[in-house]
A protein has these predicted regions:
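Class I S-adenosyl-L-methionine-dependent methyltransferase catalytic core
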Residues: 1-188
Length: 188
């Protein structure tokens, strides 16, 4: 895996071993996602199911002002920390614009809402399993942490048909890459 664009362009990002249950976003899909999201510069971004930090690091490289990573798996957190530090970033430094929340996604939504946080971009690359997208929909309704005009971008399986018309925001774009769909929703 590598960083596609920005100040860290072409730098390598550590990936999990092939046997690990982590499915990082492929470079081609990541590039397409960020082309759909442009511009990212100056935005506040939350990366849910962050894994190794691949998407959030791409956002940092492209000039995001703040990135919050949400991931609970210890192996992923270790790789994320190594990836950030390998690029000269200290995720533990206060005021550094980088925060790692090492808890389950639903608890992170609650925490961020309680803190009054609102983001320009929400990224989600959940496991390809039944029920996850519906849970994300419910969390977005219960804890509205996406700014007016903000984008919620989710990577999911083409087989996952849970994205309903009742989703809290209208779908603005969708692209297919093999078994993967990138779907973008806009708040307002």
């Amino acid at each position: 895996m590598r960083i596609i664009a920005g100040k860290f362009k072409s730098r390598a990002v550590k990936a999990p071993k092939k046997s690990a249950p982590i499915r990082p976003t492929a470079d081609k899909v990541k590039g397409a996602l960020f082309n759909m999201l442009e511009p990212v510069e100056g935005c506040s971004v939350a990366d849910f199911y962050a894994g190794t930090g691949n998407l959030g690091i791409e956002a940092i490289s492209r000039g995001a002002a703040e990135v919050v990573f949400v991931e609970k798996a210890p192996e992923s957190l270790k790789l994320m920390d190594e990836n950030l530090r390998g690029l000269g970033m200290d995720p533990g430094r206060p005021g550094g614009g980088i925060r790692i929340i090492p808890i389950e996604v639903a608890k992170a939504f609650y925490l961020l809402h309680q803190e009054g946080k609102k983001f320009d971009i929400l990224l989600a690359d959940p496991p390809y399993e039944t029920g996850v997208l519906k849970r994300l929909q419910n969390l977005l309704v219960q804890y509205p942490i996406l700014k007016e005009g903000g984008i919620f971008a989710v990577e999911h399986s083409r087989k996952d048909t849970e994205l309903e018309a009742a989703f809290p925001y209208p779908m603005v774009r969708q692209k297919k890459y093999g078994d993967t769909l990138l779907t973008l929703f806009k708040n307002g």
